[in-house]
Amino acid sequence: MRIPVVLIAATVLAGVVTGSAAATAPAPAVPSTVPSPVVTGPIPATSRPGDPSHGYPFFATDQNLRAYGYVEEEYFVGGTANRYTTPDGATGTVIDGNHEYRTRIVVRRPVSPRKFNGTAVVEWYNVTNTFDYEVVWSRSFRHLLEAGYVWVGVSAQATGVHSARGLKAWSPNRYGTLDLTDGGTVGEDALSYDAFSQAAQALRHPRGVNPLSGMKVRTLIATGQSQSASRLTTYANSVHPLAPVFDAIAIVDGGVALRTDLTTKVFKTASEYDVLSNQAARRQPDTDRFVYWEIAGASHSDRHAYLVNNPIRLRDAGVSGLLAGPTAPCVAPARSNVPYEYVLDAMFDHIVGWVRQGVQPPVAPRIEVTDTSTRPATANRDAYQIIKGGIRLAAVAVPTERNTGWNTGLTPDRDSACQQGGTWIPFDDTTLRELYPTHARYVQAVRQVTAQNVRDGFLVSADAEATIRAAERADVP
């Protein structure tokens, strides 16, 4: 099994990697008291994705996993779960236990153990839209596949299982036995925390069927975005400390402040939208257990994630997300084109090095916020209305368009979606010629910024190469 490259060139140039750091690195999390659930499966698909009989996993990926040497499988996991108190910023207590549950996990893993890098990224499905939604996968799937990660989606919340758009309604034949309410006796998603912990435990200490086909996990990373990031923050603060199963928790675009006394490593990222919405007022300094990055120009719901997941949303849920570009019902063309996924790719690799070798991820500059009492928070911007500060990928440091994290709806009912989508406004030809007299000048500027991002640890080499290739192909000026 190989360890993902943690931006070796960047960390060496930055002087981060030292022999003493590796020698004194903390050990990964030890097996906890969380029970291993009973695993059944893989649940066979009886129809192809898109078939109206719905005999396949909900949100089955349309990516060509075979080309990467991967397979997608769905399993049911079940057992008994506790309910917990979740006091603000404090460890909770068990209210009661022995609540029966059964839910599902979706596993995307290498076929060959030789390709597995030893790390499983376990995503808490977002259920804002009342169905399971895999945001982190939609952003970082390419890097996860290329670097040999396992990705696991967990249906942790009752909303995703029991709602009118949930799994049971979508395919009664496939999902009729799932239950996150103990027969209707438990509400408020109280069993979600144990369902999530036990799903992770099934990867490291399987009971019955091994959902990883015998592959051994070295590192478990929990992740979630937006709504599920908020649930994950509560989990990190109040439930996970009772019985740690994850080596690290990656919180993307959401959540309240993290406790400063947590022993599990937490890596938090925030788009420009999230910084201006609420995260600027919740900023915390980096420590040996907490890292926080802000990404300039990135939106909560960006163009890349939309293009990846919207066809599947339409196929399985029958609804579309906010359209990208000028056709969206927003004041400005919608959905930032800043590749937020590139920063998340670097984050995952850093987490592995942080957990296994004790290599501290780099500190990132913060967005230049001047007033958090306004909504959105007030921040410094340049002449092109691009925000200052934060991690600055080439899309904002060498701009050909105005990418921002905040937009406004044409009508009040569209305001929230438009705000989260941000803006993507291409520069006109005159502006492009003023900025970049020649195409070569533009490409050189992109190369310089991208090389610096790699040295700083905010970009992995494959994404740097993709950035430069895109600049070379761009019709600029």
Describe these PLM feature segments:
Residues A27-P477:
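C-terminal His-loop and adjacent cap/lid subdomain of alpha/beta-hydrolase
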